[in-house]
Amino acid sequence: MSRRRRSERREVIADPRFGSETLARFVNMLMVSGKKSIAEKIVYGALDHIEAKTSQNSLEVLNKALENVQPVVEVKSRRVGGATYQVPIEVRPARRMALGMRWLIDAARKRGEKGMVMKLAAEVLDAKESRGSAVKKREDTHRMAEANKAFSHYRW
């Protein structure tokens, strides 16, 4: 184990357009090679597209989509006497948010639409309606945890 103290969680500066810390984290996760302005253009473009398509507040739509993608439980490998068990554990709120964002962005990148703005907008709208690849990933994770519920007494 590390001899150093636990690292402190850095504060994220809220994004300038909506004043949302969650959205700022989302932009930072989408960013590739430090190109934040491009990531912001993509996210804001997707949010504008969502607002035009649904005539709802795009930030609320994004938050609902993230809520539908965030996992409640996940499995972690635990080695006991030569056998490796997939032990279901609850996900901490900060990790839950991070996983939800990561899965949403990964699912958007794999979509077939033209341009990342359209891909992200489509994936967020799908996630809001509880469908799409990101929601499927969450369901698979929950199914895995449910299947390995018998090993939950191996928690640490």
Curated annotation (Swiss-Prot):
GO terms for biological process: translation. InterPro entries: Ribosomal_uS7, Ribosomal_uS7_bac/org-type, Ribosomal_uS7_CS, Ribosomal_uS7_dom, Ribosomal_uS7_dom_sf. Keywords: Ribonucleoprotein, Ribosomal protein, RNA-binding, rRNA-binding, tRNA-binding. One of its GO terms (cellular component) is small ribosomal subunit. One of its GO terms (molecular function) is structural constituent of ribosome. The keyword rRNA-binding applies. Pfam families: Ribosomal_S7. Belongs to the universal ribosomal protein uS7 family. Part of the 30S ribosomal subunit. Contacts proteins S9 and S11. One of the primary rRNA binding proteins, it binds directly to 16S rRNA where it nucleates assembly of the head domain of the 30S subunit. Is located at the subunit interface close to the decoding center, probably blocks exit of the E-site tRNA. This is Small ribosomal subunit protein uS7. It comes from Methylococcus capsulatus (strain ATCC 33009 / NCIMB 11132 / Bath).
